[in-house]
Amino acid sequence: MRTALAVTALSLFIATALPAEMRAETVKVEAFTFAVPEGWTSVTPSSPMRKAQLEIARGPEKAEVTFFHFGADQGGSAADNVARWYAQFPGSEDKRITENVQVGPVKITFAMTEGTFNSGMPGGPTTPMEGYALCGAILETASGNLFIKMTGPNAVVKASTDAFKKMVTDGAKTAAPKV
């Protein structure tokens, strides 16, 4: 009994003594490992197409972060997907921001907009969701593009955008060759 108690106490001590970044939950998709930002929760993907899914709760409002990877030469180009994502927010043309970032060998395209989000599968029925926002990222790799998309109420997405971008850029570094 004393041994079990000692092991439990030691485990708790070690877990709390480690820096937060070493204790952080991670999500692995293909060659990338993403540290889940504090306050975000990893949940079971709601679709088999999703490789991982996170939830961000800010009071009663929730946003979701979804990860997709379809393989080499699958899922379309970064430009095609950014255009499709923006089309899910009709009338948002003046609020669209696209940024390109290079992290080692990984090209990242960030796409952000806000307005009424037409939620649903492409070509299927949609549900208009007013006051929503998008912050998406596409990581281009030889094994196929990785698509990461955060959608939810505008306030939640805007408050989470910096953490989202950090998660994505830090995750891109995990697949970059070590110098």
Model-derived regions, located:
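Bacterial N-terminal signal peptides
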Residues: A6-A17
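Boundary at the C-terminal end of the N-terminal hydrophobic targeting segment
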Residues: A17-A24
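Secretory pathway targeting signatures of secreted, lumenal, and periplasmic proteins
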Residues: T26, E30-F89
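Signature of long, low-cysteine stretches enriched in small and polar/charged residues
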Residues: E38, M49, V82-L139
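A mature extracytoplasmic/lumenal domain signature
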Residues: E38, S46-S47, H69-G71, M112-F117, ...
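Surface-exposed amphipathic alpha-helical segments
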Residues: W40, A142-V179
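Solvent-exposed, acidic/flexible segments
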Residues: S47, Q74-A78, P128-G131, T141, ...
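Structural recognition of the beta-strand scaffold that forms the well-ordered cores
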Residues: T66, T109-F110, L146-K149
